[in-house]
Amino acid sequence: MAALRQIAFYGKGGIGKSTTSQNTLAALVDLGQKILIVGCDPKADSTRLILNAKAQDTVLHLAATEGSVEDLELEDVLKVGYRGIKCVESGGPEPGVGCAGRGVITSINFLEENGAYNDVDYVSYDVLGDVVCGGFAMPIRENKAQEIYIVMSGEMMALYAANNIAKGILKYAHAGGVRLGGLICNERQTDRELDLAEALAARLNSKLIHFVPRDNIVQHAELRKMTVIQYAPNSKQAGEYRALAEKIHANSGRGTVPTPITMEELEDMLLDFGIMKSDEQMLAELHAKEAKVIAPH
């Protein structure tokens, strides 16, 4: 059996990270791979489309119900979904109470100790990426995930989050084997989005793994709690996710140590692409507008 590949999908909240990861993993299982998904997002929506169900009970919730994690059995937390994909959600505390990242640490330790990683080709971590705090960096920090895929778009905050995640990877890259596998651009139809995604990937010493076009069929499938792979296997969008899965499958050992850029460099890049205006331009436009308003008729 080939060595276990541990991958992680990071990305800012609302970028479509969980949808992208579940569709990609559904395509990957169709390539004959055995997969375990470990959801590391407090929303616990990392496995919904694979299980065709509402968010599953999380490790933290079940541990609180039973008394502690030690009182749980693997079958209590692990559910099996589309084509045998194993699913676990780590969960998080009530909003404003405690560190959500602790659920990630607790879950991964529990799963390893109870043999969840046996007999799978891939373990995939789906991780919140607005903040790369200690808990959420756990799959990186503890050298669990070896390949990180950042889901982003051409929007300013998605680019900012992608660069921040690259900083987190760099911090642990030399201590362990973690590498940036590449960027996945989830199209938001912003100006020059593909060019910008490729430029950022190059600046980060990485590559754009795939550009996922926007398609309403993704929402249609989600409303039915399904991946596009399951809902419309012959659709163009299903083909996009299969292409992405094949690229990830062929990307083993090809990750890089990222070279994150400064906020100033990121803003300069946006200026170069005409996405952002300089302070001087904005002031000139504002003054021109004000002059127009107060000009006598």
From Swiss-Prot:
BP-aspect Gene Ontology terms: nitrogen fixation
Key words, A-Z: 4Fe-4S, ADP-ribosylation, ATP-binding, Iron, Iron-sulfur, Metal-binding, Nitrogen fixation, Nucleotide-binding, Oxidoreductase, Plasmid
Residues binding ATP: 11-18
Post-translational modification: The reversible ADP-ribosylation of Arg-102 inactivates the nitrogenase reductase and regulates nitrogenase activity.
Cofactor(s) for this UniProt protein: [4Fe-4S] cluster
Domain of life of the native organism: Bacteria
EC number: 1.18.6.1
Catalysed reactions listed for this entry: N2 + 8 reduced [2Fe-2S]-[ferredoxin] + 16 ATP + 16 H2O = H2 + 8 oxidized [2Fe-2S]-[ferredoxin] + 2 NH4(+) + 16 ADP + 16 phosphate + 6 H(+)
Coiled coil: none
UniProt-recorded Gene Ontology molecular function terms: 4 iron, 4 sulfur cluster binding; ATP binding; metal ion binding; nitrogenase activity
One family name in Pfam for this protein: Fer4_NifH
InterPro entries per record: NifH/chlL_CS, NifH/frxC, Nitrogenase_Fe_NifH, P-loop_NTPase
Residue positions where ADP-ribosylarginine is found in the record: 102
Residues reported to bind [4Fe-4S] cluster: 99, 133
Cofactor binding annotation: Binds 1 [4Fe-4S] cluster per dimer.
Subunit and interaction comment: Homodimer.
Purpose: The key enzymatic reactions in nitrogen fixation are catalyzed by the nitrogenase complex, which has 2 components: the iron protein and the molybdenum-iron protein.
Family, per entry: Belongs to the NifH/BchL/ChlL family.
HAMAP family: NifH
Name the record gives this protein: Nitrogenase iron protein
